[in-house]
Amino acid sequence: MTKQAEVDYPHAVGDIGREWLRTKPFRHDPRETARLLIDFGYVLQLLDLHAGTKLCELGCGPGWMTRLAARQGVDAMGFDISPEMIEIARDQARREGIEVRYEVADMENVDLGRRFDACLLYDALHHSRSPELVLRSAFWSLRPGGRLLLAEPNWKQRFEGREASQQFGTTELGYPPRRLKRALREAGFVDIERFHNNRKRLFSNRPVDVLAHVAEPLAYRILGAFWTQIWLRATAR
């Protein structure tokens, strides 16, 4: 798997795939739309994004997270290795009348000068074979005291991403929380916290649903090392 596959991804997915990239997070499957919008709510909360916050997103893809953040008054900027992906992001920002800057950059090697208040890595790190390099880039994007938030599918992505890897040639790896925490410390981050995202789903008053809701924290404790989504927040020294 090469970086060129990441560069070519928007072309490789065809017309239907590009339409999804343009309309993300909204699609025909309401459950997927709900999942993505709930995740965005967690990003707002965990990074304390508000008007005037300077945010960069590494591996921004079509830029939907940064566009939604900009609607909150956030001063947002997105970076992605694919020029075509950046063009999609810029075009959507123009269509929506939103001011967001997008630039082509490799998240493993980008120097942003320690000027941002917050940095986001959402569903991006598993496309890199060198997460340590990406986290160093994230560290050097942040002012001292700035916060990084990363969301990753966990180690299971090595199995769930096989189809995409075989079809498009993209890198689809999964990293366990322990490795990511170690890499964060080595990059210079402190106050590393993990959060479990249950998306606060509604549940009925049927006994089986109530029992499942009560048992959920234990399940996250057991499965968190390799299966459930990873959310890590850290502070740059």
Language-model features: where?
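Conserved class I S-adenosyl-L-methionine
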Residues: M1-D48, L149-T171
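A short acidic, Gly/Pro-enriched loop at the edge of an enzyme's catalytic core
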Residues: E108-A118
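Class I SAM-dependent methyltransferase SAM/SAH-binding core
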Residues: W64-E108
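A short glycine-rich, Lys/Arg-flanked "PGG" loop and its adjoining helix->strand segment in the class I
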Residues: E132-P144
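Class I SAM-dependent methyltransferase "Motif I" SAM/SAH-binding loop
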Residues: G59-G61
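A C-terminal cap/extension of S-adenosyl-L-methionine-dependent methyltransferases
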Residues: E96, Y102, L112, L149, ...
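Short alpha-helix
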Residues: L173-G188
